[in-house]
Amino acid sequence: MPTFPVDLKTYLGGCARMEQQTFDLGEGLQVQNQTAGGHVIRSGGSARLWHGSLTLVALQHDKAREMHARLHVLRAAGASFYIGDMTHLGGTKTGQFMSIDAATGVFRLKGMTAGHIIKAGDYLAFDYSGRRAFHQFTVGGTVGATGEVGALEVVPPFRAGSAVVDRAVTVGAAKCRAVMVPGATRVGSSNRVATMGLTFDWIQTLRENP
């Protein structure tokens, strides 16, 4: 039995190539009511969690069975894995928090590679208290000669106590910690040549032991 969390691509192996994916951030809100004047009243305030689905390319039958077995492990209680946006092919860089404005969420990073460009749409991840924080840049910047960059912004906002000065971060094609959505794995269908349509849904977890 593997030690969780596992890196999804490493654990599933070289056959785990994307055919299609969704990769999205939940709203954390619900429509509670709509007034006679057409105003939509939204309620909620729950955690905004990343979620998505992954469909793998068609596999030879023996490879599909191997994939099924590994996914069975990931569907069990207590299993978790790291997954990222597979359309992001830019690699990762590391750095540290330099400063964070608690009121606005605007922050600076240090210890980055000079000249590296952080783009809106890149991802930011860091570990704290047994958890993995995962965010997406809405405002980026170019790292200066001293390895510093700011003023940066991300969604969702940092949770209280998570982002602190000197904490190490990963920038770019970073990954979040996730679990399988129960009942949402499709093992695919097979013809004489291959098995296709193997799909599963996942959702970010903030628990240390999901």
Model-assigned labels for residue ranges:
Residues 1-210:
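Extracellular/virion structural assembly segments
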